[in-house]
Amino acid sequence: MPDEPTGSADPLTSTEEAGGAGEPNAPAPPRRLRMLLSVAVVVLTLDIVTKVVAVQLLPPGQPVSIIGDTVTWTLVRNSGAAFSMATGYTWVLTLIATGVVVGIFWMGRRLVSPWWALGLGMILGGAMGNLVDRFFRAPGPLRGHVVDFLSVGWWPVFNVADPSVVGGAILLVILSIFGFDFDTVGRRHADGDTVGRRKADG
């Protein structure tokens, strides 16, 4: 009798191989972490450089016109949060920002979504930019005042870090509303599955 075909394979092995073959382009988490860090470095660098230039060139508290009185360079020292909110709680804001930075690094280990990498990178870069001021500017560590220098209309004076943090947060809210998770590629189904691909942990 002819030998029986030996092409059959263990079902579990076949399933795993098929799953692996179906995800040849699934981005590995380290790749997205690198993207997150790259965005953060760009934001942080822009924030630090523009603050140094502002401190060197702008007279404190005296607006320098860019577009009439609507858009001006105005150098101020801010003890509060983004856009001069919560002044007087400098050390609390410093601790919160530090916690945000730690949390983003923790999420970055499992990050798969490129859009989440962009949003988290914007928040990380902005948070670190203002933390540099909190730790290294007067009146002292944890109490340092943040340098703000751009005024637009009635909006409080701000710096590069502020719109980066707010813009990144808005992006993450939009992604969450539309069902995009940080550790998936694609959208969630109503039952919790994803339309895209979920990268296995580890």
Curated annotation (Swiss-Prot):
The chain crosses the membrane at residues 35-55, 88-108, 112-132, 160-180. Pfam families: Peptidase_A8. One of its GO terms (molecular function) is aspartic-type endopeptidase activity. Its main location: membrane. It catalyses: Release of signal peptides from bacterial membrane prolipoproteins. Hydrolyzes -Xaa-Yaa-Zaa-|-(S,diacylglyceryl)Cys-, in which Xaa is hydrophobic (preferably Leu), and Yaa (Ala or Ser) and Zaa (Gly or Ala) have small, neutral side chains. The active site is at D148, D162. GO terms for cellular component: plasma membrane. Residues 1-29 are annotated as: Disordered. It is an enzyme of class 3 (hydrolase). It is found in: Cell membrane. HAMAP family: LspA (MF_00161). PANTHER family: LIPOPROTEIN SIGNAL PEPTIDASE. This is Lipoprotein signal peptidase. The gene is lspA.
